[in-house]
């Protein structure tokens, strides 16, 4: 069985590589990760920035600090930025929208991904206001 499993595994790997090559080619995508806040309203036990972790040194980057990060990343060749943080109530939908617009204004050819925990549908739709277009 082990020998057969190995044969099946090799065949599965071969087919998976063919599909990967057809769909994605031989490229690597690099994203600039900006961890702009480690405040979080949640208390997920596994998470280092959970609310009850009194050893975490809390921070929030200013808009200017975040924009400096994107400027530096852009100079280094990054064209996708991930804004990542805890579920920080200080960063309202309005603040996030302003931040995304500021980044888009400085770097219109860049993609922006948000990793901010759970948000409601209105948050992602900009409360009826269109978000800046992605390239």
For each feature predicted by the language model, list its residue ranges.
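Flexible, acidic/Gly-rich N-terminal and inter-domain linker regions that tether
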Residues: 1-43
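Short low-complexity stretches enriched in small and charged residues
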Residues: 2-3, 37-39, 68, 99, ...
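Generic secondary-structure signature for well-ordered alpha-helical cores
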Residues: 7, 18-25, 49, 75, ...
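Short charge-dense sequence patches
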Residues: 14-25, 47-56, 118-122
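Canonical Radical SAM [4Fe-4S] cluster-binding loop centered on the CxxxCxxC motif
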Residues: 29-65
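Short hydrophobic/aromatic-rich motifs at helix boundaries and adjacent loops
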Residues: 41-43, 70-74
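Core AdoMet radical
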Residues: 51-66, 73-100, 104-135
């Amino acid at each position: 069985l082990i020998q057969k499993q190995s044969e099946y595994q090799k065949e599965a790997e071969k087919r998976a590589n063919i599909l990967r090559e057809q769909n994605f080619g031989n490229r690597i995508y690099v994203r600039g990760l900006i961890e702009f806040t480690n405040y979080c309203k949640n208390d997920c036990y596994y998470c280092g920035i959970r609310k009850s972790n009194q050893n975490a040194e809390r921070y929030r980057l200013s808009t200017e600090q975040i924009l400096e990060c994107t400027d530096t990343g852009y100079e280094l060749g990054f064209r996708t930025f991930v804004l990542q943080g805890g579920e920080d109530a200080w960063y309202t939908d309005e603040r996030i929208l302003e931040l995304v617009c500021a980044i888009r204004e400085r770097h219109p050819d860049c993609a922006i991904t948000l990793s901010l925990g759970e948000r409601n549908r209105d948050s992602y739709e900009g409360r009826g206001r269109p978000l800046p277009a992605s390239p």
